[in-house]
Amino acid sequence: MNARIYCLSDKILLGKTSNKSIQYVSKCLFSKGFRIDEIQILPNNVTENFDDITKFEGRQNLFVYLLDSQISYPQILNGICQKTGVEKTISNIAKTVIQSRYSSKNIPMPKESADCQFVPEGAYGVGNIYSDIQCVVLSRKNDFYLIMSNGEQEIETYLDKMLTFVLQNQPQYKQCQTFKTFGLSEQNIKQVLADLIKNKDKISINVYSDNLDSEIIIRSKSEQVAFNEYVGKVFSRLNKYIYAEEAITMEQTLFKLLSNANLCVSFGESITHGNIVNSLMTANPEFSKYIKATYVFQDAKNICDRISAKTSTIQNFGNSSVETIFEVSSNIINETGSDIVCGVVGSFENEVCKSYVAVGDKNAIHVYKNTFCAPFCEAIDSTTKATLFYLIKKLRQNDFHFDKKTV
């Protein structure tokens, strides 16, 4: 099924809030087998003809409308009703939820909130306890129209239930395989798999990317031998970029590997300013059981003082170099006695982040150079993920590609 997402949000357009909700919705749709054809961010007050944002016909489609404000609700509702020829009606569920919210506060109901009591006749609805914008799905012919609030709490609470209604009569996939990769963009992956994606065996291959962290989902609606052949080909072509063979994050993958092997790791960070360890602890506080020590280095003096690195090494090669991170990592693993060491140093200038990542044990430490061209926060995030990726590959297979210097 094809999907289009329309987010009506002045706040996102003005840069007052992030578009995390859009990312969450698109990833959720993708994981359930939807193909996302378009994502648009529009102002709260939609001035375009409604037909302009319901463009495609003749296929089974899902239109998702994420609303930031109550003023958008009647506009979208009226547009859907006019397009489908359905009348508006007051929903008892919406009426009860909205009226109880204002009666409990002992304040009159605004007109914008009263308008949110209306839904298309015959629509499926779920009462939203967090805001006046209700969760509504209308099914007409080949199309589904989903309206809901853009709030993260509402989306996390109600989206899955609404999509379950949409998919309840759809053919279910009987075979499914997921691969998680790092290091290739969505466009790069689609180029590598182009001939497999355009197949005649009705094997669905979809790619969803968050920067360089990607998810490839292979599906089939019937049991067939060809499915395993496609899985094998995808794995063969992307093997060196794959860090998991299920729909889990890097942090979840790393935790499974460390806990299963009962290994501890020590970290040394400069350019990432502690972001690596912070991302792990935020994802799962249980990581504390497997993190032996952490070092965050602010400058060259700090490196020398904390882990006894030679001043001459930094003077000769600089704060960010293969030699420096190798010596830093060697000293860390010797001083802490951890099973694994993981270190990163780097520099950021003119939206170019150059870093050196060291991963290894007492037998061998290997250093990898990464270059990311992006704004600071995005570059640090990519450097953090690249570091975790190398660590995962070390723990999984010890299959480093020593001739590769950039991700």
Locations of the language-model features?
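Glycine-rich phosphate/diphosphate-binding loop of Rossmann-like nucleotide-binding domains
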Residues: 1-41
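Conserved hydrophobic helix-helix packing surfaces used for dimerization/oligomerization
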Residues: 3-5, 145, 265
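Glycine-rich beta-strand-to-loop/alpha-helix junction loops that act as flexible
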Residues: 8-10, 60-74, 221, 344-346
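Gly/Ser/Thr-rich loops at beta-strand to alpha-helix junctions
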Residues: 11-19, 67-73, 150-154, 212, ...
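Glycine-rich oxoanion-binding loops at beta->alpha junctions
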Residues: 26, 30-52, 90-133, 301-339
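Short alpha-helical segments enriched in small residues
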Residues: 46, 225-226, 231-407
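Proline/glycine-rich low-complexity loops and linkers
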Residues: 48-54, 58, 71-166
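Accessory alpha-helical/coil subdomains and C-terminal extensions
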Residues: 140-212, 219, 226-227
